[in-house]
Amino acid sequence: MTRFLASIKDIDEAKIASTVDIDIIDLKNVDDGALGFVGIELVSKVKRLLPNSILSATMGNDLNPNNNMNIKNLKMVIDKEINYLKIGFFDNAYLSEHEHILKDINFKNTQPICVMFADKDFNLNNVEKLIAMGYSGIMIDTCYKNSKSIMDLLTQKEIKEFLKI
């Protein structure tokens, strides 16, 4: 199955997206690193503009997602009934912090998605651990957008193993 995800950074792009058949509209501050958070105001505006669209939001670039500001943002975005929240897994040292937020936050109907980075502390052994903690899905991305692609960074064996999980 092929699906189309389009990242948007502002309300003007959301208006354009409203005229096109897009499977998932991803709210992302592209000027703020790999998973820049657009802010709750834009999340609210886009949800009002596109109430029937499938929306995802990147939740920022915190190494430790279990911090007061991120938890506050997560809860506000969940209250807006966004379909998917993308939370970055930037550092293996913070694996247990992901478990804490997944257990402590009521995600209601919002699905938390863990974003692992092929070019930053990637460890295939963590995929099953992250799913067991409560992530609804795992995706692989690149953290440094001007570096190599996922196909350059991971072996075919790693990609096949990831797809089997």
Residue map of PLM features:
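N-terminal entry module detector
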Residues: M1-D31
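Alpha-helical scaffold elements within enzyme catalytic domains, especially in hydrolases
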Residues: I16, L49, M76, D104, ...
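Glycine-enriched alpha-helix->loop->beta-strand junction motifs that scaffold or abut catalytic
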Residues: V20-I25, L50-N52, I78-Y84, N106-Q111, ...
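Active-site-adjacent beta->alpha loops and helix N-cap segments on the catalytic face
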Residues: D31-P51, P65-N70, F89-N109, K120-N125, ...
